[in-house]
């Protein structure tokens, strides 16, 4: 089918907007590609240092036999359940490389933090900027410059965007991303959320809450809700940077190792394209479409702006909004529905979604991927024979229409994310998880300086009414733009009581957040004299996700005359002290706004 006119138009304006930086980026790639291989180009001492730690046979291959050498960048640690399976991946990949006459080295490791561990703590204020630390660590790893290809081992929220940003700065290298897959299903996400809401009301204690949380998060692999980590995997499939169909295979399955080995084969294959060529404006648009069609994480309205910039491309929220108006919602996965990602995979998974979008003219088909068979390869399901040989089978109809629907009969005719703008600035809302009767909320404001203040007001019973909770001083420059996911249970309790409730903030919410209408990423942020600094208790605020507006219903003269508030001195000082936050002062000081991707490296 012909490409949808809106996709064509959005892609064309991104191409035009990005002409100068993209040309400079590609010129840099061409210059890097024309050089001799590292082991031939570097001095003898450099080469000796580079390969001194290798087994003897590998040294012979890479130096004397001029074998191709893969650089592995790993985000392994066993703090993250999603990354624990990565521990032994380098050994598997090295073995597979040797089978094909090549070598592989762990070029370096990057940090990986778990937002589930740091939610509601000072550590969460390092979260967003850890993406750029990961990008820098990826660049440091690859800066040894003795690699002919690269493999990126990572899964979670900031890790994949950080690895991708770093890899794009070495965009002349063929690069494949290697995931670990989701943990098997435990306590359902809906049941877990109900226990959290009961705990917020004091109806259950710590022991029962811990039991529920441990039953939900019970083993190795990605969390099973469709948050930022699993959205990462969907977007990598849509961009053709995975082995096809590898996103949601559980860590314990035999198929998982077969796919991991195939990543090494793919990156060594003759003609595997450089990642900087794969990630062009068409691939970025494909990722945006996949995000919208699945109701993915709002965090990617920040992260993929940064990813695009790393490839010399400029996108903005208007591009997302234009696409959202024509991209249908095809998936209902928690928090957008009851199913988890294992049920999503069983119903047809990413391959089903990509096939439906391609057939509807809602994705670019003329793109490069790490598969020689192009993007259509990602519409098939991998299977392994007894001898571990891989093949890919066609995906039929959705096996569960409560989870996945065809483009001709979607859950919604439009995407799961919306742009909001008005006299409070520009922000975004994830509507796919919000009941339709809550898409418009108009109520008096209650202004908070911290999420702890909101929690205290809830516990004191001060919010048992229609209310729009404004939580400010949560932007990139204020305190690193933490996720405020801990606010979901109390706000959900208020909504469950029948009150019309919404959140407005310059901070972020987790990819797992939903249910309660939340205007997030509001920019300019309050610390930059953004409009949220003018809001006062009692101002009536209207959040309208139908019309795409976000306004304080205050007359223009009064609004203009208000002097923007400043954060309390005590809070301003506390935000930068302790728990390593001092080390990120330069990041906060230099960060642009959320819509610019909060890219501290520009």
Question: Where do the model's predicted regions map?
Answer:
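N-terminal small/polar loop signature for handling phosphorylated ligands or for N-terminal nucleophile
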Residues: 107-145
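Contiguous domain-boundary segments centered on the initiation and propagation of an alpha-helix
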Residues: 131-138, 145-150, 455-456, 462-466
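Catalytic or ion-coupling anion/metal-binding cores of large enzyme and transporter domains
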Residues: 1-68, 74-78, 82, 91-110, ...
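A short, small-residue-rich loop immediately preceding and capping a beta-strand
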Residues: 141-163, 174-178
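Acidic/charged coordination and interface sites in well-structured regions
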Residues: 88
